[in-house]
């Protein structure tokens, strides 16, 4: 993963953790946790691709990696919809900027995970 993506994840997670969205703070914490989980999953796929011969190791470690991959894409789609919804309802410019950056990052990560997964198939 390049350093820009790492800093983007860290920046967005830090910004989201500082937001106070009232009664929806539990939802926001859930989004933050999913963002962190997605980052770790993306990193592990990237490492497997870098080792390239690691497909068998990946399959042995997690025999259901295709199912897990599908599940991660569902999580990404859910997060994208949730971020879009938050973007529509917020009037705070700090939150709007944060959610716009989060949306852009999610779209980039989705594309990277697709690229990694095609290389592993």
From Swiss-Prot:
Gene Ontology CC annotations of this record: host cell nucleus; virion component
Subunit structure: Interacts with protein M1. May interact with host nucleoporin RAB/HRB and exportin XPO1/CRM1.
Protein known as: Nuclear export protein
Family named by the database record: Belongs to the influenza viruses NEP family.
Entry's localization field: Virion; Host nucleus
Disulfide-bond pairs as recorded: none
Main subcellular location: virion
UniProt keyword annotation of Transport present: yes
Species whose genome carries this gene: Influenza A virus (strain A/Grey teal/Australia/2/1979 H4N4)
Function comment: Mediates the nuclear export of encapsidated genomic RNAs (ribonucleoproteins, RNPs). Acts as an adapter between viral RNPs complexes and the nuclear export machinery of the cell. Possesses no intrinsic RNA-binding activity, but includes a C-terminal M1-binding domain. This domain is believed to allow recognition of RNPs bound to the protein M1.
Motif (Nuclear export signal): 12-21, 85-94
UniProt keyword annotations, A-Z: Host nucleus, Host-virus interaction, Transport, Virion
GO biological process annotation, one example: exit of virus from host cell nucleus through nuclear pore
């Amino acid at each position: 993963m390049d350093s820009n993506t790492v800093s983007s994840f860290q920046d967005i997670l830090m910004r989201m953790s500082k937001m106070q969205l009232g009664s929806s703070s539990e939802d926001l914490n859930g989004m933050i946790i999913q963002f962190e989980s997605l980052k770790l999953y993306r990193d592990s796929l990237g490492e497997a691709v870098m080792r390239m011969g690691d497909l068998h190791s990946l399959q042995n470690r997690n025999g259901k990696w295709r199912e897990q991959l599908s599940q991660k894409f569902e999580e990404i789609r859910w997060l994208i919809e949730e971020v879009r919804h938050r973007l529509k309802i917020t009037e705070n410019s700090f939150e709007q900027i944060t959610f716009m950056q989060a949306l852009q990052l999610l779209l980039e990560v989705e594309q990277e995970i697709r690229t990694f997964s095609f290389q592993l198939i």
